[in-house]
Amino acid sequence: MKRWQSWLLLAVVMVVVFCGYVFLQLRTIEVERLSDDLWVLRGLGGNTAVLRTDAGAVVVDTMLLPLQGQRIRQLARELTGADTTQLINTHYHIDHTHGNPAFEPGTRVLSTERTLSHLQALDADFWQGEAARLLPTETFSDRRTLSVGGKTIELIHPGAGHTDGDLVVLFRDEGVLHTGDLMFNHYYPNID
């Protein structure tokens, strides 16, 4: 077999394996209720938070693919009975942001300034056309407190950690902290 054919076969096998992996993840999402109005979605390669407010759902981290984002959007609607009005990206890595385009135009998207800067610089090809509408629309550098539909959410940039634009999300009323990739269970996080 010619060398290029071997590489092509390897690429096809990798694509098939990856598609199977994504399909299995979408079928095996574990939903855990943390409070009356807060859920965590597990099984997408990370944790996505979904908060019900009187002004719609708030989603933290949308995962790797628009297909995963569609599933998150669907689950958020089922859990909260409302459309998602706000997305929060804890950092710029694609496994936390590339589901954004699955959400409706006009969805408020929040991140740190550094996260937006990295998304625009490092991943510019992805964020063209329709996807550009779901880049972060509001940014901050240090800390921001949101009042959303009767809920208080604090966005805190603790400094450089996993990336230089990390943020943690404190759901004040629920007493829950979403740490993005700053904390892992049973191992240490990577640092860029």
Question: Which role does the model predict for each range below?
Answer:
Residues R3-A55:
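Zn-dependent metallo-beta-lactamase
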Residues E32-L75, L167-F171, G175-D181:
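Conserved beta-strand hairpin/beta-sheet module of binuclear metal-dependent hydrolase folds
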Residues V40, V58-D61, T85-N89, E154-L155:
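Short catalytic-loop micro-motif centered on adjacent basic/acidic residues
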Residues G45-N47, A57, L64-L67, Y92-H96, ...:
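Solvent-exposed loop/turn segments at secondary-structure junctions
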Residues M63-Q70, I94, L134, D192:
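Soluble non-cytosolic domains of exported or imported proteins
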Residues Q74-T145:
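Active-site HxH/HxHxD metal-binding segment of metal-dependent hydrolases
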Residues T139-V176:
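Core dinuclear metal-dependent hydrolase active-site scaffold
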Residues H186-D192:
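Cap/insert and terminal regions of metallo-dependent hydrolase folds
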